[in-house]
Amino acid sequence: MRVLVWIAGLAPLAVAVPSSSYRVAVAARADNTSASVAPSQNVSGAAPPELVVYTLPCEDGNSTARTAEIRLKQATLLYGPSLLGNASYFPGGPLGDAISLRDQTVWEGAAVVQSLRAFTDAAKVAANIKQNGGLNSLDDFKVLYQDGWKGSVPQGIARGQSENYTSDLLFSMERLSVNPYILKRLHPTEDALPFQVDRATVKQLTKTSLKALHAAGRLFVADHSYQRNYTRLANRYSAACTALFYLDPRSNQFLPLAIKTNVGADLTYTPLDTDNNNWLLAKIMFNNNDLFHGQIFHVAYPHAIAEIVHLAALRTMSARHPVLALMERLMYQAYAVRPLGERVLFNKGGLFEQNFAYPQDMVYKFVGDSYPTTGRWRAGYLDTDVRARGLVDADYGPELPHFPFYEDGSRLVEVIRRFVRSFVDATYHESDEMVAKDAELQAWVAEANGPAGVEDFEPGPLDTRERLVEVLTHMAWLTGCAHHVLNQGEPVTASGVLPMHPTALYAPVPTSKANTTADLLGYLPSAQKSVDQVTLLARFNRPDVVPTNQTLRYMFAAPQLLLGNGEAYRRANQRFVRAMGRISDEVKARRFDDRGLSQGMPFIWQALDPGNIPFYLSV
């Protein structure tokens, strides 16, 4: 007597269990373009060979085989050591290894195609730079992007990034868009000032004092001082900047006030340091720290935290469980990124070390140091996070007039939540009691809070539909939204655009403002290294998700989920697709207003366009 257990596209694993006919298929993964279905496509025809009708444990007529399946997974899918630093466990054991290898194969197929595009584009751009006579000024960096990267980055870089690169407003608003995870508002009584700024300078810039701004809840900080003791690679340099921002009481704009380097002479720069382009250099130094933060932060949040919650579910829930099937869809190819990252990106001498200032061990250090905080599940809920940092609904300071990350993100979360609520209500027949009595669901929660070691997970028992809705909504936010704010196409289109966002500095941090060379070219990558930087970041982009309907808009449109979950699921998916389509149309239509601004910024930010970003953890 045998059961054929299909684990998300692997060859069948035949194991001896007490059943002769029970077949399990985790069929929700998008291993090909048919895994997502546009609204116009017919999904009511012939069922796939391994059609699964997803059922709760209490509704399954073959509980013996279901229990045997879970026992098999617990014996062969283990908690292995973390990869890319000390974060969450990574799948181990025979089944864990097989799942990861399967995901790596899928990931590498897309990566090879995208890399070839990037290399082809890079050759054309290098020729353009040669024809220009090199990159001989800051403005020349526009040549790096003009008429280039059309194959690998068809969406182009964010409009305004090249044209307005010297803008202080652009610099400050990037903290509220391209990397919103480092910023916090300083509480007037609970947070001390991170450093002092010359009184006369503050008065000239703000017409008030640092103390008054602090007391009014108008001061914000972005702190990368943790990088001060990081080892740098030979002939690469970086500061460890802490930046102060303020909400101007006159213009109501969010603006930069000062940047402190925290290394060497520990200079503090302000917008009044215009001689020798010192202030521009200070912004470049901060952006260099910030680009490192965004790229490595995203290893822990969302990758590591989403993986461990899903791994706990795999070990405790049947593949026939509708909740696990939904998570399987969200975690498409997820277990490729960390092992491949170790092998080709963060390895000694690998792509990261070829471009960034820090070696592999500093990457691992950042992940290990940050994960106890970034890996907290409930603290990472979108609204919980931004409120904890005083960026939304702070009772000790005025509201930010624009917060593009939250404006876009909260709309997506609400659409996701509406779908998930419909799914949970239909699955549990609108009964909290059924949620509480779902043995596999409760086992998952106990596993996450126990052996899996998930920090700050929902405590058990998980006894209401609404709490389950929040967990699944956050899972979808992590894989289909939060990831793409920091990675995917965002670095090549905004957070890594040169000359303001180099992956490394190529001259030492100044020990005196008088020593800065005004053209700043010595601090920036050479023409070839600039092409290398853009090439690397372009390889993170995934434009093919648009024609294959693997975008966020089609997150829940896997044929097997549509067929295996009933009519209520199909109707909810149709509403989801329409709502995300409307948001996508609005994001694509963004233009500058009569002040040259979009969402209060002098560049157009489209990182959370649900019609353009993957529904999954792509890179």
Swiss-Prot record:
One of the record's GO molecular function terms: linoleate 9S-lipoxygenase activity
InterPro entries reported for this sequence: LipOase (IPR000907), LipOase_C (IPR013819), LipOase_C_sf (IPR036226)
Cofactor note: Three His residues, the carboxyl oxygen of the C-terminal Ile or Val residue, and a fifth residue, usually Asn, ligate the metal, which binds water to form a catalytic base Mn(2+)OH(2) for hydrogen abstraction.
Glycan attachment residues as annotated in the record: N32, N42, N62, N86, N164, N229, N515, N549
SUPFAM superfamilies tied to this protein: Lipoxigenase
Keywords annotated in UniProt: Dioxygenase, Glycoprotein, Manganese, Metal-binding, Oxidoreductase, Secreted, Signal
A GO cellular component entry from the record: extracellular region
Cofactor(s) needed by this chain: Mn(2+)
Enzyme class: oxidoreductase
The Lipoxygenase domain, residue ranges: 55-619
GO biological process, one term: linoleic acid metabolic process
EC number: 1.13.11.-, 1.13.11.45, 1.13.11.58
Signal peptide coordinates: 1-16
Chemical reaction(s) catalysed: (9Z,12Z)-octadecadienoate + O2 = (9S)-hydroperoxy-(10E,12Z)-octadecadienoate; (9Z,12Z)-octadecadienoate + O2 = (11S)-hydroperoxy-(9Z,12Z)-octadecadienoate; (9Z,12Z)-octadecadienoate + O2 = (13R)-hydroperoxy-(9Z,11E)-octadecadienoate; (9Z,12Z,15Z)-octadecatrienoate + O2 = (9S)-hydroperoxy-(10E,12Z,15Z)-octadecatrienoate
Binding site for Mn(2+): H298, H303, H483, N487, V619
Cell location: Secreted
Superkingdom of the organism of origin: Eukaryota
Main function: Lipoxygenase that metabolizes linoleic and alpha-linolenic acids to 9S-, 11- and 13R-hydroperoxy fatty acids. At the end of lipoxygenation, the intermediate product 11S-HPODE from linoleic acid is then transformed into 9S-HPODE and 13R-HPODE as the final products. The intermediate product 11R-HPOTrE from alpha-linolenic acid is transformed into 9S-HPOTrE and 13R-HPOTrE as the final products. 9S-HPOTrE is further oxidized by the enzyme to 9S,16S-DiHPOTrE as the end product.
Family to which the UniProt record says this protein belongs: Belongs to the lipoxygenase family. Manganese lipoxygenase subfamily.
Name the UniProt record assigns to this protein: Manganese lipoxygenase
Organism the protein comes from: Pyricularia oryzae (strain 70-15 / ATCC MYA-4617 / FGSC 8958) (Rice blast fungus)
